[in-house]
A protein has these predicted regions:
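Conserved binding/recognition cores within well-folded domains
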Residues: 1-79, 83-85
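Eukaryotic intrinsically disordered, low-complexity regulatory linkers and tails enriched in Ser/Thr/Pro
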Residues: 1-9, 90-102
Length: 102
């Protein structure tokens, strides 16, 4: 499956397996894959398109569960070395999602 994106004046298809995470800043969402793509859409729009390998974490981030290497109460480490802050209250739901997806 692929995510269809219109960014930088062109239409792109990004395979789900390439997407590590998505995060939001103001009114823009950045899709972090092999390259980063920033588009003016809501995180909720993406959440509807993505499948169960993705988990929304708080208001500002969606993670691809297969890239998660380690989770603590305050941060998530991805397999590429990226460390992301974990919002308060997100630890338990994220752990449940990881267990269900395994």
């Amino acid at each position: 499956r692929c995510l269809n994106l219109e960014a930088y004046g062109e239409m792109m298809r990004i395979p789900f397996y390439e997407i590590r995470y998505l995060d939001v800043h103001q009114n823009y969402v950045t899709v972090h894959a092999k390259a980063d793509y920033t588009v003016k859409r809501t995180l909720g729009d993406f959440e509807k398109e993505l499948d169960d390998r993705f988990c929304r974490v708080g208001r500002a981030m969606i993670l691809n569960l297969k890239y998660i290497q380690r989770v603590t109460k305050t941060e998530v480490r991805l397999s590429d070395g990226t460390v992301l802050p974990l919002p308060r209250g997100a630890y338990e739901p994220l752990n449940r999602a990881i267990i269900q997806h395994a």
